[in-house]
Amino acid sequence: MSYVIDRRLNGKNKSTVNRQRFLRRYRDHIKKAVEEAVSRRSITDMEHGEQISIPGRDIDEPVLHHGRGGKQTVVHPGNKEFTTGEHIARPQGGAGGKGPGKAGNSGEGMDEFSFQITQEEFLEFMFEDLELPNLVKRNLTGTDTFKTVRAGISNEGNPSRINIIRTLRSAHARRIALSGSSRAKLREATSELERIKREEPDNFGDIQALEVEIDRLKARIRRVPYLDTFDLKYNLLVKQPNPSSKAVMFCLMDVSGSMTQATKDIAKRFFILLYLFLKRNYDKIDVVFIRHHTSAREVDEEEFFYSRETGGTIVSSALKLMQEIMAARYPSSDWNIYAAQASDGDNWNDDSPICREILTKQIMPFVQYYTYVEITPREHQALWYEYERIGDDFADTFAQQQLVSAGDIYPVFRELFQRRLVS
């Protein structure tokens, strides 16, 4: 009897390796589809994957074939249309497609290949190459510290970490599985031999045959190794990062009367995308939500996105509150401070210089990165130009961009938060 032992480490997902290879091969198609989905779907609608379609012509495998020309002697069935030396016309056809049209009676094509990517894969492509810039470590001058923690049992490892009990248990189970039928037959043969010796002691032929069978079964059982490499089990130890830096992200949003509902919706989407990014990439990060009109308040996530409160426009109120929270809870000696501000650019005229002064003297010297997005199709106003002066003084830690429609959110988001090397 033959035994087939499946020793693949990912037995429950036997196509995982093939799927990962496929995703790497068609990365460009998938990234393009994900970017289109992000601009099309609501930012809050990120809890599922996406249907990806790849044109049939792009999944064709390269093949070797005979080129045109040369001489070949081939026997074909007779016909009434062609004579010696004539070229056979290529059949009509084309790639498959979607959309309205009339049915045809000739030609053939190939439909698009469609498949579903998971939410995890969708977010992985969406946030690829994104990282909070200039994340530096505080209170340590060296590299990150790690702590070693137990992480279960592994089939591979250092001999010094072998788990003897798990190894012997696995070996015992394997021996039972591989020699179980032989042991059962051995017990039957032994019982039969004892019966014959007791009842028919002169039946030497059967006694000899049973003794030969018993010797064969014992030899077969002995051939099952006591310990196999597959039985070896090791204590798995992994290095778990011991965070040596703490980060806080301030989210400032204008909810004044000058912000239309469409503008507020774009601002909300930008911050929801930012919030998803932070929660996915940074487990140890605080997020502070500040809404402002003529006055500013620190609110929770629910109120930040969905409250209907509105009013006039004094942007400096949010900056003052941010500075107070920084001083009270997030000293720059212990925290990496980041901020993102969204507004339509409208502000009380005398307040814009105050905003620049607060940012220049009380905020920018203490933050790692500050980004401002202005959501408007109109010409920029005083606040934008005051912020441009800040960008001249803090080119490495300040950035500003303009949003016009919801479709601009993702490209602007990538541009603001694309990965940068720490100098």
UniProtKB/Swiss-Prot annotation:
Pfam families, sorted: DUF444
Biased composition (Gly residues): 93-107
Transmembrane annotation, as ranges: none
Region feature (Disordered): 65-110
InterPro entries assigned to the protein according to its UniProt record, in alphabetical order: UPF0229, vWFA_dom_sf
Family of the protein in this entry: Belongs to the UPF0229 family.
HAMAP family (UniProt xref): UPF0229
Protein name per Swiss-Prot or TrEMBL: UPF0229 protein PSPTO_0546
Lineage: Bacteria, Pseudomonadati, Pseudomonadota, Gammaproteobacteria, Pseudomonadales
